[in-house]
């Protein structure tokens, strides 16, 4: 992989301005000691989403047991135990924010016997009990390919089950050394074949993959029962992370979208700043 590129192209320059509900969203999250992937993963869309009064809740703390080389989330072999109040605090925040579509995600917790699956279950149940009309999108980890743990979450029947394959097979060992491409695809397949869930996945580009490799991964997703996909530009969080190989042009993102739709993926979002949960409500089953 090449060294990090010195200058971002114009299409990757954001005008940052906090307005609207930004301050209220930040205060609400801080008061309830809630983590968001928006902040922990250094998402470029944080100000836009928080200003619209939306956020993606990060379960099981903000310390991950894995060291994926693209991710800004902090790591440790044994993070603090999960906050038992988190499910109710998230449910309360959803109610106060008056959300219609809620995105939940989590760090990997390989230190826990069930990978945090029961905590996921409690959170989903708490959110629905307090907000019966809300739709849930769950962006889940792989639970170390433990079917029993995975099924605890799938059995709660979220309206959208999201699991990102993240990248193509040829660089998986570099990007996600503690994960497995086939295992991630099989999560999508199990959610579809055994639970008939609406499924979603995501890819980052600009890490050394080729156009044809991305197209093949889109084929793989379709063959494993994926309904929706997001494709976005990888941005290096720090000097210790994988360097950006190239900046993918908006035109190439449009090509990915065209290919994905031609393969039968019914909801596709493809662009430089696209992230898994960005404008997730517009990719929900009702849209």
Curated annotation (Swiss-Prot):
The record's top EC class is: transferase
Name any one GO molecular function.
metal ion binding
Classification via InterPro entries: Aldolase_TIM (IPR013785), Elp3/MiaA/NifB-like_rSAM (IPR006638), Lipoyl_synth (IPR003698), rSAM (IPR007197)
Domain (Radical SAM core) ranges? 50-266
Q: Which reaction does it catalyse?
A: [[Fe-S] cluster scaffold protein carrying a second [4Fe-4S](2+) cluster] + N(6)-octanoyl-L-lysyl-[protein] + 2 oxidized [2Fe-2S]-[ferredoxin] + 2 S-adenosyl-L-methionine + 4 H(+) = [[Fe-S] cluster scaffold protein] + N(6)-[(R)-dihydrolipoyl]-L-lysyl-[protein] + 4 Fe(3+) + 2 hydrogen sulfide + 2 5'-deoxyadenosine + 2 L-methionine + 2 reduced [2Fe-2S]-[ferredoxin]
CC cofactor note = Binds 2 [4Fe-4S] clusters per subunit. One cluster is coordinated with 3 cysteines and an exchangeable S-adenosyl-L-methionine.
Give the binding site residues for [4Fe-4S] cluster 2.
Answer: 64, 68, 71
Its subcellular locations are: Cytoplasm
State the EC number(s): 2.8.1.8
Source superkingdom? Bacteria
Classification via NCBIfam families:
lipA, PRK05481.1, PRK12928.1
Name the PANTHER family on file. Answer: LIPOYL SYNTHASE, LIPOYL SYNTHASE, MITOCHONDRIAL
Please report the name of this protein according to its UniProt entry. Lipoyl synthase
Q: Which organism is it from?
A: Chlorobium phaeobacteroides (strain DSM 266 / SMG 266 / 2430)
Traced from the root, the source organism's taxonomic lineage reads: Bacteria, Pseudomonadati, Chlorobiota, Chlorobiia, Chlorobiales
Instruction: Name the encoding gene, please.
Output: lipA
